[in-house]
């Protein structure tokens, strides 16, 4: 069983990493290709492409200029410790034990516009490049064309020793589109998190993102390798709604008082 998460736009490179243990991303050469494309853009072009403010565009232009194919403790941080958004508030990797992180290293992957796919302890240099960005590149019109089957094939490598290969999709729709189901040698299960609001259950973005991180942490702490055990997930008041779920879409619901 492998869990995939989306990355986060916000990053924390100020807090020192709680472990020195690290690995290197699998697709550094491919990332360098994208950096070459991004370095040709002015801050104004970056702002227009990514729909971000002038200060953010300038920051990311600097990040692309500073990016190096040589990853060091000075310019990099482990991915799961560097990402700092709603999902990662739920995951809270900084409070995971060392053996938890090692389990995550085997069973958790983070999809990335720049890096393709990351292990939790892969060193990562700061960047912003959302998977849905329409960045023309030598391989096509956008990042889905750039990554092609590569991310899916990398995931397939993880399933070679797995009798019942299951990919648990805790990523956003934008990011999961880089995974090609027809190429993937695994069954896909997508947990969906709904909250009660205005007389009905609905997906509320902030809560749903945090819940994805909470479920990833739950799987790590409980050493879950059989996805069926995820149905017992009950963190923060969520409960599996069997009647509204099917084999591929698992619904978890809660009512906040």
From Swiss-Prot:
GO terms for biological process: response to hydroperoxide. Transmembrane segments: none annotated. Pfam families: H2O2_YaaD (PF03883). GO terms for cellular component: cytosol. PANTHER family: PEROXIDE STRESS RESISTANCE PROTEIN YAAA, PEROXIDE STRESS RESPONSE PROTEIN YAAA. Belongs to the UPF0246 family. This is UPF0246 protein Rpic_2164. It comes from Ralstonia pickettii (strain 12J).
């Amino acid at each position: 069983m492998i869990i995939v998460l989306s990355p986060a736009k916000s990053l924390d490179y100020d807090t020192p990493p709680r472990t020195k243990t690290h690995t290197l991303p699998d697709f550094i050469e491919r990332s360098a290709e994208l950096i070459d494309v991004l370095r040709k853009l002015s801050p104004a072009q970056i702002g227009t492409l990514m729909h971000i403010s002038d200060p953010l565009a300038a920051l990311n232009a600097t990040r692309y200029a500073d990016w190096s194919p040589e990853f060091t403790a000075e310019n990099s941080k482990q991915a799961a410790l560097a990402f700092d958004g709603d999902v990662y508030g739920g995951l809270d990797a900084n409070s995971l034990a060392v053996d938890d992180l090692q389990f995550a290293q085997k069973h958790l992957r983070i999809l990335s516009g720049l890096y393709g796919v990351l292990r939790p302890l892969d060193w990562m240099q700061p960047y912003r490049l959302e998977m849905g960005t329409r960045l023309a590149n030598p391989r096509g019109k956008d990042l889905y064309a750039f990554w092609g089957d590569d991310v899916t094939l990398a995931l397939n490598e993880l399933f070679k020793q797995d009798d019942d290969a299951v990919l648990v999709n805790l990523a956003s729709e934008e990011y999961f589109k880089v995974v090609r189901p027809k190429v993937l040698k695994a069954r896909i299960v997508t947990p969906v998190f709904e909250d009660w609001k205005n007389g009905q259950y609905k997906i509320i973005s902030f809560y749903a993102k945090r819940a994805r991180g909470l479920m990833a942490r739950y799987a790590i702490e409980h050493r879950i390798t059989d996805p069926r055990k995820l149905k017992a997930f009950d963190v923060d008041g969520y409960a599996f709604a069997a009647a509204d779920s099917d084999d591929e879409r698992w619904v978890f619901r809660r009512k906040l008082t």
